Curated annotation (Swiss-Prot):
GO terms for cellular component: cytosol. Its EC number is 2.7.7.7. This is DNA polymerase IV. PROSITE patterns: UMUC.
Amino acid sequence: MGERRIIHIDMDYFFAQVEMRDKPELKGKPVIVGGKASGRGVVSTASYEARKFGVHSAMPMAQAHKLCPDGYYVQPRFEVYKETSQIIMDIFKSYTEIVEPMSLDEAYLDITHLVRPDLSASAIAQFIRRDIWEKTGLTSSAGISYNKFLAKLASGMNKPNGITVIHYNNVNEILMNLDIGDFPGVGKATKEVMHTNGIYNGQDLYNKDERELIRIFGKRGHGLYQKARGIDHKPVKNFRIRKSVGTERTFATDINDDEEILLKVRELSEKTAERLSRIQKSGKTVTVKIKTYQFETLSRQRSLRDPIRSDIDIYNTAYSLYNELKDPDVPIRLIGVTVGNLEATEYENMSIYDFL
């Protein structure tokens, strides 16, 4: 098996950035999202302007008010954050099926199968970050490396709105000079134990014998020993294998104009083909779904002998299925095109432009 390519995407000050996006008057201000200071509320997210005052996540809100009395304090809107997160996760899944969400605002992506001589991991990460910006108006940071630990570390090295790559040829320099508190997974309590045992940076950790680390930290000692050497064999665990790819659109008004509907079918076929191309899949079934003005859902599906993924092939099949479904006297409000029964696609004829 060749070298893996893992991306860790971390949204920049996610909750605060969403609030600044939706309330432009907050841009450039010290924004703190969290519970009420009068109770036991804590800071969920602080903008970089607020962090300059020492405010950080998980800090009691009362303490944040003392550090930044002129800050802009905002109650969290979790439904909005969840909706925005879903858009971001859908972008990830349009590139690869192997996505491991860690929270609303971060995830690991295994893109090993996408990287080629003419398409680097850095380029793919830039495309993903571009899509996030265009669809949500939010910036993100990306870390790229050959394992999850290093990708996570890299994503925090050039924030906000940055991208960092850790290669085999620079990993030792980065790890040896890294403050021990900056190692992913080393919190305040662990850091104190590290200092007690003379470990202040990656070089100090590297110099410790594995048995000694196990004596100090128990089972965690083995993992810390490996981290000091940039070792992490854990796979990116995707929680769902995609069985189909599709898109649908709701019309502003109910329509029964064939020409207008077929233009939309063509557009949906192109979008579906683009998503298939990104995840390097083809499919052997095509489904067309319509919803009538009376909210009745109708669909037709066709199984094909050979898998397809081009927009022309998808459209031709979808066109035929729509003709089986249509009723000139029944306006429709929604139409969708889906390709299912997916299988891997050879990519030698693909180019970087499939990702643009």
